[in-house]
Amino acid sequence: MSKKRIYEYAKELNVKSKEIIDELKNMNVEVSNHMQALEDDQIKTLDKKFRQQESNNNTKQNTQNNHQKQQNNNNNKNNNKQSNKGNANQKGNNNNKNNAKNNKNNKNNKNNKNNKNNKGNKNNKPAAEPKEMPSKITYEEGITVGELADKLNIESSGIIKKLFLLGIVANINQALDEETLELIADDYGVELEKEVVVNEEDLSIYFDEEEADPDAIERPAVVTIMGHVDHGKTTLLDSIRHTKVTAGEAGGITQHIGAYQIENAGKKITFLDTPGHAAFTTMRARGAQVTDITILVVAADDGVMPQTIEAINHAKEANVPTIVAVNKIDKPTANPDRVMQELTEYGLIPEDWGGETIFVPLSALSGEGIDDLLEMIGLVAEVQELKANPDKQAVGTVIEAELDKSRGPAASLLVQNGTLNVGDSIVVGNTYGRIRAMVNDLGQRIKSAGPSTPVEITGINDVPLAGDRFVIFKDEKQARRIGEARHEASVIQQRQESKNVSLDNLFEQMKQGEMKDLNVIIKGDVQGSVEALAASLMKIDVEGVNVRIIHTAVGAINESDVTLANASNGIIIGFNVRPDAGAKRAAEAENVDMRLHRVIYNVIEEIESAMKGLLDPEFEEQVIGQAEVRQTFKVSKVGTIAGSYVTEGKITRNAGVRIIRDGIVLFEGELDTLKRFKDDAKEVAQGYECGITIEKFNDIKEGDIIEAFEMVEIER
């Protein structure tokens, strides 16, 4: 005899298979799924619980079920009694059953049929009560009709009907936009709340500023020194370092890690050792906001110079306070007042003149005024109330990075919040790792670093970029997963942005000596056109670059053509042919330049102009949709009507169109009429049918593709 499976046993008792599985697990029985067979001893143990529950539940059921249970019990107890007595009891019970039926309505009769096997329903409800509609639901972008119906506890057909009344034809898998969702929710009186999906691979989310953190404590200010070349930025940095660092570290060797810390009046200050604003701008371009205070160095004998203005603009865009250090005041030709006067034109007005900008006269060479500058930095930092929480997981920014021959990839980091520890799992930029060693700006090995502390770490898998952000994760697997995902995404992005040749950048690459040959793939509608075009292109004579035909063929542009163009760094010219869907996707992904023409002269002129650096297109063709001709109708005085189904994008009334048959362009012109049912339509979207007539063209056949396009003006 075959053994009874879990789901069969559950069905017999009218309970869920999960309840049986849970009970078996409580009995220390390993269960793989509901198809597992039960042993006899397991069934006996389960019977003790579930049969007893069933018996208790049945005593609470309606009159009919009570009599039925009593009949079963009597039959079990009186097995040895005479059959006629058993029949009498049976009749008595049947009478009771009939009486119970007469006292119940039709709805209960249906439930009695369902309960004929003595199922253990606790409440003996006649039917499952409909769930109450919630007053508020949350949704994700792209929610479908079916998913919305589940959230509202209603049938999806109800939503589909409402959409139909709103003029929207939809099915259960149709995605709903926010406007449609609001209409439906308003109709049902339900409040909507959009769920924000957090992308854990986006490191910027870990840098979001929270409300006032009660555990935050004061942290050192991070200072960047900027200014014009030869105005004394490096000398000022060296002077501060020599005065405050080397003097306090007898015999100590300062490790160059792109930043260093000093202590002044009992408070630490972190200086970014990146003179100039190139690195500063690079960091800001990558979203890194690391600087708290900017020091603008201006030579007293030279005044405001072009790079000074550039530095002022960078500081303003970064929205950080600026302290002006008027350097070289010990020179005979120094004129600090002239510097102040010139800087007022750029919004930097000295406090002495009623402004808010602090000016500090100093000499980086002699050290005069250095203490005053450090004091002003401390005052500005105090006003800013710079705080951070050292008890959090560390986050921060890469200052510098290099590939060391002995240690592998090394990165100088600035901790902006939290505490960085040796052994932490880190994601930095598009790489990850586990911190193996950590060195401070004095070359000392340390085990932890708090906010605003610059350190150099090793243990990461690759070299990050300056300005990349880093985040510490408790779980090493999570750090690995996020790091690998970010690396993969960056590789894909680099492929998409690979510098393939196009007619737009051809002349630029020629000037840089990067282009010697222009590789061309030609696809045409007939062999004669292909040969004529190839011969014409070979005759183009421009100094510095040769046209090289690497492939010619007849037919539509396909994916293998794009692959060849990408591998050979070439362009594709289509003459009276179009790319198929796969070729379009591949060209966009690989950034391959495709040029489609119908006149040979235009091809020659375009390529020759590009090679001479004269190419200046003002408009670009943009395909907006395709429709497949399903049926044609010939109407007198109208012409051929193409009954079409929009397969991609949309067809608009004012768009240009071309008729494509077997990948060959037959005609290019304009729409005459566009109708949806009997009404004129401005546009017909994907998934809908429409009637189309083409101006001055009636040779439309079933299976033809109508491609709609617009000419879009592009910036050069």
Curated annotation (Swiss-Prot):
Ranges where the record places region G3: 273-276
InterPro entries: EF-G-like_DII, IF2_II, IF2_N, P-loop_NTPase, Small_GTP-bd, T_Tr_GTP-bd_dom, TF_IF2_bacterial-like, TIF_IF2
UniProt keywords, alphabetically: Cytoplasm, GTP-binding, Initiation factor, Nucleotide-binding, Protein biosynthesis
Compartmental location: Cytoplasm
Biased composition (Low complexity): 56-125
Main location: cytoplasm
Residues covered by region (G5): 363-365
Binding site for GTP: 227-234, 273-277, 327-330
Chain positions covered by the region annotation Disordered: 52-135
Chain spans, region G1: 227-234
Any single Gene Ontology cellular-component annotation: cytosol
Domain called tr-type G: residue spans: 218-387
Region of interest called G4, as start-end residue ranges on this chain: 327-330
GO terms for MF: GTP binding; GTPase activity; translation initiation factor activity
G2: annotated segments: 252-256
NCBIfam families tied to this protein: IF-2 (TIGR00487), small_GTP (TIGR00231)
UniProt similarity note: Belongs to the TRAFAC class translation factor GTPase superfamily. Classic translation factor GTPase family. IF-2 subfamily.
PANTHER family: TR-TYPE G DOMAIN-CONTAINING PROTEIN, TRANSLATION INITIATION FACTOR IF-2-RELATED
Function: One of the essential components for the initiation of protein synthesis. Protects formylmethionyl-tRNA from spontaneous hydrolysis and promotes its binding to the 30S ribosomal subunits. Also involved in the hydrolysis of GTP during the formation of the 70S ribosomal complex.
Protein name per Swiss-Prot or TrEMBL: Translation initiation factor IF-2
Source organism of this protein record: Staphylococcus haemolyticus (strain JCSC1435)
Lineage, opening ranks: Bacteria, Bacillati, Bacillota, Bacilli, Bacillales
Gene: infB
